[in-house]
């Protein structure tokens, strides 16, 4: 093959399989608290190059212009002709001090290059030594100044040209004054902050007002209301907080025991319009980072999807079922508990399925179909299906969710817990991690545009979303390693015009948490993506993580999206998501109305999902193409609204499996997975299998089941052609269980 016949290579697929670095986990192992302020140079300096004029010595063709390397889009790139030397330069518009250059190389990179600056674009000064490039992200700390900055490549590493996804220059005077930051930020009108000196009657009145406005309301489930109640460190007198839709209660201490509430943080049935008799629609609420001394000894948290309890200390008992659970209709259906301590007994009662991770409990009583535990001290023994407990001694990889707290000086900070491996028990007190001052966050508020949010990211800030709805006419692009993107009070991102709402680059350590996505009325190919298709970079030491991220196709909006979440980056941690194509909403729903093929697409290798809820999509609901994937707890309901069998024929027969592992995957594990059918539009509809996986010894499923809810609709087998059908001859929503496959 001669050079003139070459075209740019496909994205690189090689991996560096480094594993655990001792220093990265030593502090956590020894139980030492590590608190440090983030010092990434780009967190203090501005991104100067994005969107500025760029030129190059050559381009391979018009598809790969110089401007593509400074457009903030990691899916476009500059590529040169196949010769040495070549350069790419950006005009910053005025002379700036330069502190850092970040190069995101495609597979065709430089084996020797320098970074140069110039005041006039003709006389150049080296501000870096001759440097070898690398496939993927490369960060150079430099010192210099100039209006023009260029990468001057002298030797290619491949027969191809030089190719950069992004060329980022940082420096200047720092933050944009139009994007103010503060260590005592305004969190907006939907956030109430209490102190121990606040009268209990004031707190009670505030939480009652929020809840009573939702009491048997026909609109609250998909309403615009958002309520966050934050408690500064201290002890609070009797507060009985009923928790409704889009409501969060959280402590502002560094540890849960820094905030003590006497009374209850209560979720029950009997109040939701049209569904008063059960708790199966108790969605979108949360409790975090506080302790409760429950009145009467037991706190009630009868929730279903998208209702996490994290970093909580229950100084008594905890029940997860509604108070009418013994009256024939009292069900709750699927919750999540992590990084918590329950001194007494956890009673699950009529809770149909539940996942508990890295916690300590006194004892667990009960279980209906699918109760899963990983890293839980005091968990029941593994006994699936009778009783239906699936228990793992540890969780393979964890990084707990970032949380807001107030330091001793009254300043606000975000604590980012460190990565743990083979973890068990709560990660507090003495949590290892990093404390970031709020001045390094842009505090987003409803009404902020995508351009304003991207400008904050471009100047090196993290993002903190306050409660409310954000309409986005462009994609929010997170490109800097270790960026924290978090929210409180279920901030909801709605794309318009079919754009993707959030794009996370294939770089180390980005953390996304506490966000809700609503599909817009114009179909989006994806609502959120992580990494770039076809690229496999080893992030094992510092993975990207997603926590409490929820997706809806259909809500108050008749949304459409082909795939809600696509994960391309290797080693990504998916810790508690709910991807939901709505079976009901504030706006009408239906088979041809709120359309969506797939909830989760995983192309990355070594991806771990802990607490995976995906429901009602129209084709394969989870597609797992990456190798060495692991899921601990999976909950699914098939689409209710299939009109007839002819409308729902998949590649291998009737319908689509809920959980599809690609035929070429050689290594995959799932512990504790349930898929349920309720084909109420046409009960004659059937799906041939709930789980579809290749028949290989390395692909292993443990504790999986199917249920026909109310015996409405048929799932013919659990896994491939194994397990038998539901409805069972026994009827009465009796599950089919497969303990191990193969």
Give, region by region, the residue ranges found by the protein language model.
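Extracellular carbohydrate recognition and processing domains
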Residues: 125-142
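Secretory targeting and sorting signals
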Residues: 1-43
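A short beta-strand element within beta-rich, extracytoplasmic domains
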Residues: 96-107, 151
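Extracellular/periplasmic carbohydrate-active domains that bind, remodel
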Residues: 175-742
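Disordered, acidic Ser/Thr/Pro-rich linker "stalks" and the adjacent N-terminal cap
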Residues: 30, 44-93, 104-109, 129-132, ...
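Short beta-strand-plus-loop segments that form exposed binding edges in beta-rich domains
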Residues: 152-159
């Amino acid at each position: 093959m001669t050079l003139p016949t070459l075209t740019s290579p496909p994205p690189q697929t090689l991996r560096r399989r480094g594993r655990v670095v001792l220093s990265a986990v030593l502090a956590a192992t020894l139980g030492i608290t590590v608190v440090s302020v983030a010092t990434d140079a780009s967190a203090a300096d501005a991104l100067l190059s994005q969107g500025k004029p760029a030129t190059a010595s050559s381009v391979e063709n018009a598809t790969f212009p110089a401007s593509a390397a400074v457009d903030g889009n990691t899916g476009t790139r500059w590529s040169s002709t196949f010769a040495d030397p070549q350069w790419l330069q950006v005009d910053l518009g005025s002379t700036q001090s330069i502190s850092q250059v970040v190069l995101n190389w495609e597979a065709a990179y430089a084996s020797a290059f320098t970074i140069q600056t110039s005041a006039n674009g003709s006389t150049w000064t080296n501000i870096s030594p001759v440097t070898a490039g690398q496939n993927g992200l490369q960060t150079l700390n430099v010192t210099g100044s100039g209006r023009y900055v260029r990468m001057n490549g002298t030797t290619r590493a491949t027969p191809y040209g030089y190719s950069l996804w992004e060329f980022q220059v940082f420096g200047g005077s720092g933050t944009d004054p139009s994007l103010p930051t503060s260590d005592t930020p305004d969190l907006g009108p939907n956030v109430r902050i209490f102190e121990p000196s606040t009268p209990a009657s004031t707190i009670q009145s505030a939480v009652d007002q929020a809840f009573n406005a939702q009491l048997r309301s026909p609109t609250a489930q998909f309403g615009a209301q958002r309520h966050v109640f934050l408690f500064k460190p201290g002890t609070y007198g009797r507060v009985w907080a009923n928790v409704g839709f889009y409501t969060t209660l959280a402590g502002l201490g560094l540890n849960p025991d820094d905030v003590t509430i006497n009374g209850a943080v209560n979720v029950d049935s009997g109040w939701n319009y049209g569904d008063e008799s059960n708790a199966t629609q108790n969605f979108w609420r949360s409790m975090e980072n506080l302790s409760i001394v429950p009145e009467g000894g037991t706190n009630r948290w009868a929730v279903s999807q998208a209702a996490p309890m994290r970093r909580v200390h229950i100084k008594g008992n905890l029940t997860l079922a509604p108070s009418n659970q013994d009256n024939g209709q009292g069900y709750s259906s699927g919750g999540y508990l992590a990084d918590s301590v329950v001194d007494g007994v956890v009673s699950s009662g009529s809770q149909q399925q539940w996942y508990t991770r890295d916690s300590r409990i006194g004892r667990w009583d009960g279980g209906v179909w699918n109760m899963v535990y990983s890293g839980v001290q005091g968990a029941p023994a593994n006994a699936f299906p009778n009783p239906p407990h699936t228990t793992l001694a540890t969780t393979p990889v964890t990084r707990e969710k970032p949380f807001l707290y107030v330091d001793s000086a009254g300043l606000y900070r975000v604590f980012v817990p460190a990565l743990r491996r083979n973890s068990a028990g709560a990660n507090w007190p003495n949590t290892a991690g990093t404390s970031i001052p709020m001045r390094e966050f842009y505090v987003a508020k409803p009404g902020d545009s995508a351009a304003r949010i991207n400008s904050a990211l471009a100047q090196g800030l993290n993002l903190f979303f306050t409660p409310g709805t954000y309409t986005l006419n462009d994609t929010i692009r997170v490109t800097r390693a270790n960026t924290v993107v978090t929210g409180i009070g279920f901030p909801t991102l709605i794309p318009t015009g079919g754009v993707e709402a959030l794009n996370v680059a294939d770089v180390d350590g980005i953390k996304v948490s506490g966000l809700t996505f609503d599909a817009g009325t114009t179909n989006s190919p994806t609502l959120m993506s992580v990494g770039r298709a076809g690229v496999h970079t080893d992030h094992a030491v510092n993975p990207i993580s997603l926590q409490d991220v929820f997706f809806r196709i259909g809500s108050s909006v008749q949304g459409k999206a082909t795939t809600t979440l696509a994960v391309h980056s290797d080693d990504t941690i998916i810790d508690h998501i709910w991807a939901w194509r709505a079976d009901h909403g504030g706006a009408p729903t239906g088979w041809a109305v709120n359309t969506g093929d797939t909830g989760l697409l995983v192309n990355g290798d070594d991806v771990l999902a802990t607490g995976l809820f995906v429901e009602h999509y129209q084709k394969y609901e989870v597609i797992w193409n990456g190798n060495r994937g692991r899921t601990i707890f999976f909950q699914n309901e098939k689409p209710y609204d299939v009109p007839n069998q002819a409308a729902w024929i998949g590649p291998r027969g009737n319908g689509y499996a809920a959980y599809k592992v690609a035929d070429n995957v050689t290594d995959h594990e799932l512990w504790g997975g349930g898929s349920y059918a309720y084909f109420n539009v046409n009960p004659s509809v059937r799906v041939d299998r709930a789980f579809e996986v290749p028949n290989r010894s390395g692909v292993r499923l443990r504790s999986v089941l199917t249920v026909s809810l109310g015996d409405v609709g048929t799932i013919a087998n659990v896994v491939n052609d194994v397990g038998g059908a539901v409805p069972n001859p026994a009827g009465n929503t009796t599950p089919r269980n497969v303990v191990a496959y193969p």
